[in-house]
């Protein structure tokens, strides 16, 4: 008997909603990445996108443990000389809380074309409103 590999056409994509109100960033990001990859399903195959869509709400209410709010730094570079920009977690949470969640989850996904496809299924919003009510997302408890 040979091992069965999931086919992209056979995979049913579900929608999940995650409320990050009071949740720890890293613990929530690992669970979100697991669902995006499809590791929660019995038909998981590493070479096939078996993951589901994840809608994250209340991104601005996520917590970080210890003194990471002031000590954890995020860097980006514009490509121009002197173009290095840096911000700590508190500044990121104040200006772009969606990017803080996205960066944490993206680092936990594969660094290839399949990982980019998985990352596109992540939808992050500040506040509790989102435009995906028509998909009837299921509650994902973290």
Curated annotation (Swiss-Prot):
For this protein, the record's Pfam families field holds: Ribosomal_L13 (PF00572)
Alphabetized InterPro entries for the sequence: Ribosomal_uL13, Ribosomal_uL13_bac-type, Ribosomal_uL13_CS, Ribosomal_uL13_sf
What keywords would UniProt list here?
Ribonucleoprotein, Ribosomal protein
Q: Does the keyword Nucleus apply?
A: no
Family of this protein: Belongs to the universal ribosomal protein uL13 family.
Instruction: Please give the NCBIfam families that the UniProt record associates with this protein.
Output: rplM_bact (TIGR01066)
Query: Which HAMAP family is this protein grouped with?
Result: Ribosomal_uL13
- Job description of the protein: This protein is one of the early assembly proteins of the 50S ribosomal subunit, although it is not seen to bind rRNA by itself. It is important during the early stages of 50S assembly.
PROSITE patterns, per this entry? RIBOSOMAL_L13 (PS00783)
What's one GO BP annotation on this UniProt entry? negative regulation of translation
The entry's protein name is: Large ribosomal subunit protein uL13
Quaternary structure?
A: Part of the 50S ribosomal subunit.
GO CC aspect terms: cytosolic large ribosomal subunit
Coiled-coil regions listed in the entry: none
Q: Does the keyword Ubl conjugation apply?
A: no
GO molecular function list: mRNA binding; structural constituent of ribosome
